[in-house]
Curated annotation (Swiss-Prot):
Pfam families the UniProt entry points to: GDE_C, hDGE_amylase, hGDE_central, hGDE_N
Post-translational modification: The N-terminus is blocked.
Taxonomic lineage: Eukaryota, Metazoa, Chordata, Craniata, Vertebrata
Catalysed reactions, as listed in the record: Transfers a segment of a (1->4)-alpha-D-glucan to a new position in an acceptor, which may be glucose or a (1->4)-alpha-D-glucan; Hydrolysis of (1->6)-alpha-D-glucosidic branch linkages in glycogen phosphorylase limit dextrin
UniProt xrefs under Gene3D superfamilies: Glycosidases
Function summary: Multifunctional enzyme acting as 1,4-alpha-D-glucan:1,4-alpha-D-glucan 4-alpha-D-glycosyltransferase and amylo-1,6-glucosidase in glycogen degradation.
Listed EC numbers: 2.4.1.25, 3.2.1.33
Organism: Oryctolagus cuniculus (Rabbit)
Quaternary state and interactors: Monomer. Interacts with NHLRC1/malin.
Sample GO molecular function, one term: amylo-alpha-1,6-glucosidase activity
Protein name according to UniProt: Glycogen debranching enzyme
Main location class: cytoplasm
Recorded GO CC terms: cytoplasm
Length: 1555
C-alpha cells in the first residue's frame, strides 16, 4: 500500500499520542508492517532498532480472512531458536468486527535476524524477515556507541608482531581517533601465509608467542576488554567459513569435509583436465613447447594463440572428456536386444512426454551412463517377433544412442571452448596485463594456471593418475580448491552437482585453500559443523563483532547456524560483511537472513569525485530539510547500513591509482557520510603500495609522540595524515552521536565536493569542503581559480582546515622491518579557529537571499588539491530564535520538538492559548470550512482552491487539500515536489492558508489568526526548512481538528476503528453552510435552528447545514441538494455519526417543500424544485423512521412544525411561518396523495427546465395498485427512480428516451413503501401517529384503506409478483418467455416494456434491508448469491447483469457516436459499478446470513470485511478522502464520476454499523 497508508496512520497516531508518552517525554517508536496476500518479502530489508514496537496489520487483501502470524522472535527471556515459531495474538483496540485496526505486535529487545510468515487458514500466504540492529557499548561507563558513529581500522594480524608489542602498534588506531579495530584472522596460518588461509581455526597463531611465553585466546580476550574499557575501542575479527588451508592437519584426517572425488564424483572430469593442464604447465616450464611457440616466458598474444592451438591439438584429443557423459553403445544395444528377445516381453505403454535420454552415471566412469530401458522398449517396438524386426529395432535404438552420445560430445566441446578462454584470460592477467602481477616465466612455483585440486602423491603420467580416481582411499584426498566465480549466482554453490565451474575453468582459484563441504545440515558432515561452531564460539567469546569474509560465497544455512551460535554468547554481536553479488535484491537476502549489521562499501569503487559524493548520499542520512516523520508509521524497505571505507585491505593502493594528495580529501568525504566509516592501517601513514595479505611479513609501526618523521619504525601526529584523521574521526563520532542525520552533497566543480551534515533539531550544520586529487597535482593541471561558495547561515568557526604538503625530508624508501609510509608528505592542520584566521579562506562576505535568507559568501585562496576545510554553521541568530519559538509551540503536538525549542514571552498572545482550546469551540459546519470545500464551494465566497504552478490545483481549499499532497510526499521525503518548490519560492501558499480563514468570522478567524501567528515565525526561517515546518504546523492543527470533529460525533464513531472515523469525516466533508442558503427556511417557531448575521444586510438569517450530493459536481448553487441523494445518505452521514439536529433540520426543510404528495429531487432552495422523481419521498419517509428509532426522543420530530412552502399544489411559494403543520400531517398527506393517485404536468415544462426530455416525459404519474398495494408510476418517457439517465444524443437518436425508465412498480420503492406502511401501522396502534388509514375518493365515493390492509396487501403479493422461481413450471409468471435468470427478484413489476421487469439489477437488495419481512430467507439467499456472482465488483455493484444484451460497463459521457446504447453516456446505469448499492447488498447479506447456519454467517462476515477493505484502501489513497459515485467495470477509474459521493460513503458506514 505504500504511503497511501499515511492517512490511516495519522488517525491511529491520534489515539496513540494520548496514551504512549514515556517518562522522558519521548514517544515510543512503532512501525507498521501491512500483510498482503501472497506477498513474499524475503528480498526486502526491514531494519529496526531495539526498543521499537513492530505491529503486523492486515492489508486489504487479507481483511475478513482467518490470518495467523508466526515468528521465530523469542518470548522475553527465551533463547532464540531459528526453527521454533510461535503464533502472535491479535489485538483489536476497538473490539469491533471491522479489521482495519486489528494488529499483533513484537516488542523488539534482541538483535539479529528474525523470520515471520502468515497463514490464511492453513495455507502459507506470505512472509519475510526483520533485522534488529545490535546495541554497541564501550568505556568504563558502558555508554552506547551508535552504528553511525563507528570509525573502524583494519589491521593485518600477522603484521602486529609478537603479542606483547601489540598495544604499542594498536595505539596508533586509538590516537588516530578510531573506535573499532578489525583484525584479520588471528589463527594459525597455512603454508601460503595468506591472512585468510587458516591451517587451524581453533589455535591462536604461534607467531604471536615468544620462545619463553606462549600466548592464548585468554590473553587476547584480556587485551580486547582493556581496549573496550580504557580506550573506548571495540574489536572485531573475521570468520572464514568457506575454506581451510590445504595443509590443515584436520582436513587430512577428515577429507569428507572437503569436495573430493569420493563425495563429489561429478568433479572427476574436471580433475582429469586439471592434471593434464598441470603436466602441460610443467612441460612449458621445461621448454618442451618452445618450438611450438610456447616458451616459458609468455610475452605476447602470439604465445597465447599458440597455447590455445596446443591445448586443442594435443591435450583435449587425448583426454576424451566426453566419455564421462556417454553411454557404451555396444553394451546398451546388447541389453536392449536381450530384453526384446525375452519371451515375457510385452509392449509397454509409453508416456508421450517421456523421451529417451542419457542417465548420468553417479560415479562418473567413462561410458558409465545408461538409458531407461522401459522408455526404449516403449519407443522402439518391433512389428513382429522375428529376428529381422528385432534387428531393425536394435539399429534404430543404436542410432538414437549414437545421436545422444554425439550431443554430449558437442556439449563437451562447448565446455572445452570456455575452459580454454578462461585459462587464457587467466594467463593474460597474470603474465601480460598492466594491472596484473606480471609473474614472469612459467615455473612449478608459478605454473601456467593455478591448480584446481590438491594432489598429495608422487607425480606420475596422466593415464596412471586417472586410475586413482576410482580408488576411494586415494580419491578422497583429491580436494577441490576454493575461489570465486565472476558473475555467478551467489546463492548457488559452484562446487555442487549441476555446476560445471571446475570443468569450464571458470573459477578464479585460491590454490592455498580447500573448499569446505557442509551439506545441508550438521548430520551431513558432523565433524566440520562441530569444528566450525567451536571456532565461532571462540571468536564470539572474546570479540564484540565479526566480519564475514567472502560472505557471498558462504552457504546461507551455514552462516545462519554459526551466527546463531555466536549470538548466544554475544547477543549484541556486530556483524560486518563484504558482499559482491552485484544486486541489491541478492544483498538483501544475505542481510536479512544473517542479520548483517553493516555492509562494507568501498570508496575506491568511485572513479571520480562526483561518484564519491554520490556514494556519500547513497549510503546514509536523509535530505536536509526533510519532513518530520511520525513515531508511528509504516515500516518502509531500507537499504543495508553501510560501513563506508576509504580503503579496505583488499583494495589496491590509492596513492598509485589516484595520488598521495587525495588521501586527505577522500577520507574527509567518506567520514562525512551518515553511516559507519572505516579505513585500513597504512592509509593514514601514506604507505605507497598495497599491503599484501599474502606476502607482507613486515610489522606495523609503533606510536611514539617524540619520534622524528625520518624514523621508519614509529609514527605520531607528524606522520602522514594521522593528525587530520584524528580530527575527522572525532567529528564523525560527534555527528553520529548528536543526531546530524541530514546530508547534502554539493558537487562544486570537477574536483571539489562539499558535504553538509545537518541536525534537524538544533539546525546546526557542519560543511566539509574537500578538493580531491584523483590526478597527481605535480603532473596534472588544476586551476588556481576556485569557485566562490555560498553557505546559508552564520559560520561559527572553522572546525578544521588541513592541507596536504610536502616537507623537506628524503623521500620514501621501503623499510626492511616496518611497514613505513612517505615521510616527505604530511598535513598542515589547524583546528577550531575563527574564519578570519583561516589560511584557506581569502574573505567571507555576508549577503541575503530573499527577506530572511542569511548567506555567507566564501572566497578561497589556498584550497589546493589535497586540502579540506570544515565549517560549523548555525542559522543566523534571527532565524535560530524563530525556529526555537516554532518548535516550542509545536511541542503541544509532539514531544519530538522539545529539542531546540525556545520559550519567549513576547510572542503573539494567541499563541499562548493551546490550539486545541481555540479549536474546541468550532462546530462541525465550521470544521467543514477549515478542512474541506472544493473549488465551486469556495467560489461562492469569492475564493478558490490553491493552484500550484506547473502542477495542479489542490482538491480542497481547506487543510485537507494540503494534507492529501503532504501525505503523498512526506513518507518519501519528496522535497523536489512542485508543492515544496512553491513553499520555498515564496509565502503565497502560507498566506493563502491563514488568509482564507481570517476573512471569515468567529472561531474560524481565530484558527486563522493562530496559523498566521505561527506562520509569522515560519517566514523568518531559511526557505529550505519551510516545507518541513509548514507540514509540522499543519499536521498538528489538522490532527487536532479531526479529534475535535470526532468528539462531536456519536460514541460509535468516537470508539470506532480508523476506517469508521475515516468514513465519518465524509459527514464533515459533505455537510456545510454556504454563503447562500441551500435549504428552504424552517418554521420560525423552532427555537434551536442555527442563525448567523448576514454580512451584507446585517440581518439575522438561518444557516442550516445542507448535504452536498457529491464533490466536485454537486456541491454548490441549485445543484448542491437533491432529495433522493440527501435521504439515501442521511442515515449514514448524520444519524450514525450523531448529528441529530442537522438531520432533523434537513428532514423538516424538505417536508416544507412537499407538493403533489412528492418530495423534490432537485431542491433548488424549494423555489426551483423539480417534482420529477417517484422515490425521493419514500427515502424521506424512511429517514424519518430511522430518525425516530435512532435518536433519543426521536419520535418528537413527528410533532415538529413544518413550514409549508406549497400548502396546495398550485400555491405560490409561501414565506416561512405563513402556514405551519406538524410533521405527522405532512407524512399523512404524502401517503394519502399516493393512494389517491398523482398525476400532473411539471411547471415550465419544456427545454427551459430539461433540454432533453420529450414532451410526454413532463407528465408525472404515481399511485398505488388497489390489488397489490404496490406503489407504481412513471411512463416510458421519464425516469423517476435513481437510475435516471435521459438520452441526449441526436446522432445516436436516443435524445429524450430514458435509458432506464423503470416505470411500473420499482422493487426498491415497493420495499420502502412497505417499510413506511409497516412503521406507521405500528405507531398508529400505539396512538403515536394519529392516522390509522388513508381516505381517498374513488368513483365519486370516499374510500378508506387502513394501514393494516395496505401492509397486508404488499406482504401477500410481493414474492408472488417479484420472485422468479427456480422451477420453470411455476405458473405465476406472466411472461415466462422473458425469464433469463431464475432464483432472482425482478427489478420492477408491470413495466411498459415487460422485459425490463426481468433484468437483474442490485435494487432488490434495498428492499431486503428496509423490509426484510417481504422475503423468504432461502429465496433471498439464493438471489443474493446470484447478485454476488454477477453484480459485485471491487468497489461497486454492476447496475445491470453482464449477461444482458445492453450491458456495457464503461461510462463515457463525452462519447457521441452512432451506438444507441452508449452515445452520450446512455449506459450510465446499464453496467457501470455504482458504490452506494454495495452497502445495501452487504447489509442484506449480513441480515439473511444470520438466518442461515453459523458457517454461512461466518463466511459472510469474511466477505463483508474483505469487500470493505477495498473501500478502505480507496479512501486512504484518494486525495479527496472520499468514495466515488461509480467506477467503470471491474473497479476501473471513471473520470466522469464524482470523486467523492455522499451516498457512497454513507452506505459503507451503515454497513460497518451493522457489522
Amino acid at each position: 500500500m505504500g504511503n497511501s497508508f499515511d492517512f490511516g496512520v495519522l488517525l491511529i497516531l491520534l489515539k496513540y499520542f494520548k496514551s504512549s508518552r514515556s517518562q522522558n517525554g519521548h514517544s515510543k517508536q512503532i512501525r507498521i508492517l501491512l500483510l498482503n496476500e501472497m506477498e513474499k518479502l524475503e528480498k526486502t530489508l526491514f531494519r529496526l532498532e531495539q526498543g521499537f514496537e513492530l505491529q503486523f496489520r492486515l492489508g486489504p487483501t487479507l481483511q475478513g480472512k482467518p490470518v495467523t502470524v508466526f515468528t521465530n522472535y523469542p518470548f522475553p527471556g527465551e533463547t532464540f531458536n531459528r526453527e521454533k515459531f510461535r503464533s502472535l495474538e491479535w489485538e483489536n483496540p476497538t473490539e469491533r468486527e471491522d479489521d482495519s485496526d486489528k494488529y499483533c505486535k513484537l516488542n523488539l529487545q534482541q538483535s539479529g535476524s528474525f523470520q515471520y510468515y502468515f497463514l490464511q487458514g492453513n495455507e502459507k500466504s506470505g512472509g519475510g524477515y526483520i533485522v534488529v540492529d545490535p546495541i554497541l557499548r564501550v568505556g568504563a561507563d558502558n555508554h552506547m556507541l551508535h552504528l553511525d558513529c563507528v570509525t573502524l581500522q583494519t589491521f593485518l594480524a600477522k603484521c602486529l608482531g609478537p603479542f606483547d608489542e601489540w598495544e604499542s602498534r594498536l595505539r596508533v588506531a586509538k590516537e588516530s581517533g578510531y573506535n573499532m579495530i578489525h583484525f584479520t584472522p588471528l589463527q594459525t596460518l597455512g603454508l601460503s601465509r595468506s591472512c585468510y588461509s587458516l591451517a587451524d581455526q581453533l589455535e591462536l597463531n604461534p607467531d604471536f608467542s615468544r620462545p619463553h611465553k606462549k600466548y592464548t585466546w585468554s590473553d587476547v580476550g584480556q587485551l580486547v576488554e582493556k581496549l573496550k574499557r580504557e580506550w573506548n575501542v571495540l574489536c572485531i575479527t573475521d570468520v572464514v567459513y568457506n575454506h581451510t588451508a590445504a595443509n590443515s592437519k584436520w582436513i587430512q584426517e577428515h577429507p569428507e569435509c572437503a569436495y573430493n572425488l569420493v563425495n563429489s564424483p561429478h568433479l572427476k572430469p574436471a580433475w582429469v583436465l586439471d592434471r593434464a593442464l598441470w603436466h602441460f604447465s610443467c612441460d612449458v616450464a621445461e621448454g618442451k613447447y618452445k618450438n611450438r611457440g610456447v616458451p616459458a616466458l609468455i610475452e605476447n598474444d602470439h604465445h597465447l594463440n599458440c597455447i590455445r592451438k596446443v591445448i586443442w591439438e594435443d591435450i583435449f584429443p587425448k583426454l576424451h572428456l566426453w566419455e564421462f557423459f556417454q553411454v557404451d553403445v555396444y553394451k546398451a544395444v546388447e541389453k536392449f536386444r536381450g530384453l526384446l528377445t525375452q519371451e515375457t516381453w510385452r509392449v509397454i505403454k509409453s508416456d508421450p512426454k517421456q523421451h529417451l535420454k542419457i542417465i548420468q552415471d553417479p560415479e562418473y566412469r567413462r561410458f558409465g551412463c545408461t538409458v531407461d530401458m522401459n522408455i526404449a522398449l516403449a519407443t522402439f517396438i518391433p512389428h513382429d517377433n522375428g529376428p529381422a524386426a528385432i534387428e531393425e529395432c536394435c539399429n534404430w535404438f543404436r542410432k538414437r544412442i549414437e545421436e545422444l552420445n554425439s550431443e554430449k560430445h558437442q556439449l563437451m566441446n562447448y565446455h572445452q571452448e570456455q575452459a580454454v578462454n578462461c585459462l587464457l584470460g587467466n594467463v593474460f592477467y597474470e603474465r601480460l596485463a598492466g594491472h596484473g602481477p606480471k609473474l614472469g616465466p612459467v615455473t612449478r612455483k608459478y605454473p601456467l594456471v593455478t591448480r584446481y585440486f590438491t594432489f598429495p602423491f608422487e607425480e606420475m603420467p596422466v593415464s596412471t593418475e586417472e586410475t586413482m580416481i576410482h580408488l576411494p582411499n586415494k580419491a578422497c584426498f583429491f580436494m577441490a580448491h576454493n575461489g570465486w566465480v565472476m558473475g555467478d549466482d551467489p546463492l548457488r554453490n559452484f562446487a555442487e552437482p549441476g555446476s560445471d565451474v571446475y570443468l569450464r575453468r571458470e573459477l578464479i582459484c585460491w590454490g592455498d585453500s580447500v573448499k569446505l563441504r557442509y551439506g545441508t545440515k550438521p548430520e551431513d558432515c558432523p565433524y566440520l559443523w562441530a569444528h566450525m561452531r567451536k571456532y565461532t564460539e571462540i571468536i564470539a567469546t572474546y570479540f564484540q563483532g565479526v566480519r564475514l569474509d567472502n560472505c557471498h560465497s558462504t552457504p546461507l544455512h551455514v552462516a545462519e547456524y554459526m551466527l546463531d551460535a555466536a549470538r548466544k554468547l554475544q547477543p549484541n554481536l556486530y556483524v560486518v560483511a563484504e558482499l559482491f553479488t552485484g544486486s541489491e535484491d541478492l544483498d538483501n537476502i544475505f542481510v536479512t537472513r544473517l542479520g548483517i549489521s553493516s555492509l562494507i562499501r568501498e570508496a575506491m569503487s568511485a572513479y571520480n569525485s562526483h561518484e564519491e559524493g554520490r556514494l556519500v548520499y547513497r549510503y546514509g542520512g536523509e535530505p536536509v530539510g526533510s519532513f518530520v516523520q511520525p513515531c508511528l508509521r509504516p515500516l518502509m524497505p531500507a537499504i543495508a547500513h553501510a560501513l563506508f571505507m576509504d580503503i579496505t585491505h583488499d583494495n589496491e593502493c590509492p596513492i598509485v591509482h589516484r595520488s598521495v594528495y587525495d588521501a586527505l580529501p577522500s577520507t574527509t568525504i567518506v567520514s562525512m557520510a551518515c553511516c559507519a566509516s572505516g579505513s585500513t592501517r597504512g592509509y593514514d601513514e601514506l604507505v605507497p603500495h598495497q599491503i599484501s595479505v599474502v606476502s607482507e611479513e613486515r610489522f606495523y609501526t609503533k606510536w611514539n609522540p617524540e619520534a622524528l618523521p625520518s624514523n621508519a619504525g614509529e609514527v605520531n601526529f607528524q606522520s602522514g595524515i594521522i593528525a587530520a584523521r584524528c580530527a575527522i574521526n572525532k567529528l564523525h563520532q560527534e555527528l553520529g552521536a548528536k543526531g546530524f542525520i541530514q546530508v547534502y552533497v554539493d558537487q562544486v566543480d570537477e574536483d571539489i565536493v562539499a558535504v553538509t551534515r545537518h541536525s534537524p533539531s538544533i539546525h546546526q550544520s557542519f560543511v566539509a569542503v574537500s578538493r580531491t586529487a584523483f590526478r597527481n597535482p605535480k603532473t596534472s593541471f588544476y586551476s588556481k581559480d576556485v569557485p566562490q561558495m555560498c553557505i546559508p547561515g552564520k559560520i561559527e568557526e572553522v572546525v578544521l582546515e588541513a592541507r596536504t604538503i610536502e616537507r623537506n625530508i628524503s623521500p620514501y624508501r621501503k623499510d626492511e622491518n616496518s611497514i613505513n609510509g612517505m615521510p616527505n608528505i604530511t598535513v598542515e592542520i589547524r583546528e577550531h579557529i575563527q574564519l578570519n584566521e583561516s589560511r584557506i579562506v581569502k574573505q567571507a562576505g555576508v549577503t541575503t537571499k530573499g527577506p530572511n535568507e542569511y548567506i555567507q559568501e566564501i572566497e578561497f585562496e589556498n584550497l589546493s588539491p589535497g586540502s579540506v576545510i570544515i565549517f560549523r554553521v548555525s542559522l543566523d541568530p534571527h532565524a535560530q530564535v524563530a525556529v526555537g519559538i516554532l518548535r516550542n509551540h509545536l511541542t503541544q503536538f509532539s514531544a519530538h520538538f522539545k529539542a531546540g525549542s525556545l520559550a519567549v514571552d513576547n510572542s503573539d498572545p494567541i499563541l499562548k492559548i493551546p490550539f486545541a482550546s481555540i479549536a474546541s469551540k468550532l462546530t462541525l459546519a465550521e470544521i467543514n470550512q477549515i478542512l474541506y470545500r472544493c473549488e465551486s464551494e469556495e467560489q461562492e465566497d469569492g475564493g478558490g482552491c490553491y493552484d500550484i504552478p506547473n502542477w495542479s490545483s489542490l482538491k480542497y481549499a481547506g487543510l485537507q487539500g494540503l494534507m492529501s499532497v503532504l501525505a503523498e510526499i512526506r513518507p518519501k521525503n519528496d522535497l523536489g515536489h512542485p508543492f515544496c518548490d512553491n513553499l520555498r519560492s515564496g509565502d503565497w501558499m502560507i498566506d493563502y492558508v491563514s488568509g482564507r480563514l481570517i476573512s471569515r468570522s468567529g472561531t474560524i478567524a481565530e484558527v486563522g489568526k493562530w496559523l498566521q501567528a505561527m506562520f509569522f515565525y515560519l517566514k523568518q526561517i531559511p526557505r529550505y526548512l519551510i516545507p518541513c515546518y509548514f507540514d509540522a504546523i499543519l499536521i498538528g492543527a489538522y490532527t487536532t481538528l479531526l479529534d475535535i470533529a470526532w468528539k462531536q460525533m456519536s460514541s460509535f464513531v468516537q470508539t470506532g476503528s480508523t476506517f469508521v472515523k475515516h468514513l465519518s469525516l465524509g459527514s464533515v466533508q459533505m455537510c456545510g453552510v454556504g454563503k447562500f442558503p441551500s435549504l428552504p427556511l424552517l418554521s420560525p417557531s423552532l427555537t434551536d435552528v442555527p442563525y448567523r448575521l448576514n454580512e451584507i444586510t446585517k440581518e439575522k438569517e438561518q444557516c442550516c447545514v445542507s448535504l452536498a450530493a457529491g464533490l466536485p459536481h454537486f456541491s454548490s448553487g441549485i445543484f448542491r441538494c437533491w432529495g433522493r441523494d440527501t435521504f439515501i445518505a442521511l442515515r449514514g452521514l448524520l444519524l450514525i455519526t450523531g448529528r441529530y439536529l442537522e438531520a432533523r433540520n434537513i428532514i423538516l426543510a424538505f417536508a416544507g417543500t412537499l407538493r403533489h404528495g412528492l418530495i423534490p429531487n432537485l431542491l433548488g432552495e424549494g423555489t426551483y424544485a423539480r417534482y420529477n422523481c417517484r422515490d425521493a419521498v419514500w427515502w424521506w419517509l424512511q429517514c424519518i423512521q430511522d430518525y425516530c428509532k435512532m435518536v433519543p426522543n426521536g419520535l418528537d420530530i413527528l410533532k415538529c412544525p413544518v413550514s409549508r412552502m406549497y400548502p396546495t399544489d398550485d400555491s405560490a411559494p409561501l414565506p416561512a411561518g405563513t402556514l405551519d403543520q406538524p410533521l405527522f400531517d405532512v407524512i399523512q398527506e404524502a401517503m394519502q396523495r399516493h393512494m389517491q393517485g398523482i398525476q400532473f404536468r411539471e411547471r415550465n415544462a419544456g427545454p427551459q427546465i430539461d433540454r432533453n426530455m420529450k414532451d410526454e416525459g413532463f407528465t408525472v404519474i404515481a399511485g398505488v395498485n388497489e390489488e397489490t398495494g404496490f406503489v407504481y408510476g412513471g411512463n416510458r418517457f421519464n425516469c423517476g427512480t435513481w437510475m435516471d439517465k435521459m438520452g441526449e444524443s441526436d446522432r445516436a437518436r436516443n435524445r429524450g428516451i430514458p435509458a432506464t425508465p423503470r416505470d411500473g412498480s420499482a422493487v426498491e420503492i415497493v420495499g420502502l413503501c412497505k417499510s413506511t406502511v409497516r412503521w406507521l401501522l405500528e405507531l398508529s396502534k400505539k396512538n403515536i401517529f394519529p392516522y390509522h388509514e388513508v381516505r381517498v375518493k374513488r368513483h365519486g365515493k370516499v374510500v378508506t384503506v387502513s394501514y393494516e390492509e395496505w401492509n397486508r396487501k404488499i406482504q401477500d403479493n410481493f414474492e408472488k409478483r417479484f420472485h422468479v422461481s427456480e422451477d420453470p413450471s411455476a405458473s405465476n409468471e406472466e411472461h415466462p418467455n422473458l425469464v433469463h435468470k431464475r432464483g432472482i427478484y425482478k427489478d420492477s413489476y408491470g413495466a411498459s416494456s415487460p422485459w425490463c421487469d426481468y433484468q437483474l439489477r442490485p435494487n432488490f437488495t434495498i428492499a431486503m434491508v428496509v423490509a426484510p419481512e417481504l422475503f423468504t430467507a432461502e429465496k433471498a439467499w439464493k438471489a443474493l448469491e446470484i447478485a454476488e456472482k454477477k453484480l459485485l465488483g471491487p468497489l461497486g455493484m454492476k447496475t445491470l447483469d453482464p449477461d444482458d444484451m445492453v450491458y456495457c460497463g464503461i461510462y463515457d459521457n463525452a462519447l457521441d457516436n452512432d451506438n444507441y446504447n452508449l452515445a452520450k453516456g446512455f449506459n450510465y446505469h446499464q453496467g457501470p459499478e455504482w458504490l452506494w448499492p454495495v452497502g445495501y447488498f452487504l447489509r442484506a447479506k449480513l441480515y439473511f446470513s444470520k438466518l442461515m447456519d453459523r458457517e454461512t454467517n461466518a463466511r459472510t462476515i469474511f466477505l463483508v470485511k474483505n469487500v470493505l477493505s477495498r473501500h478502505y484502501v480507496h479512501l486512504e489513497r484518494s486525495p479527496w478522502k472520499g468514495l466515488p459515485e461509480l467506477t467503470n467495470e471491474n473497479g476501473q477509474y471513471c473520470p466522469f464520476s464524482c470523486e467523492t459521493q455522499a451516498w457512497s460513503i454513507a452506505t459503507i458506514l451503515e454497513t460497518l454499523y451493522d457489522l
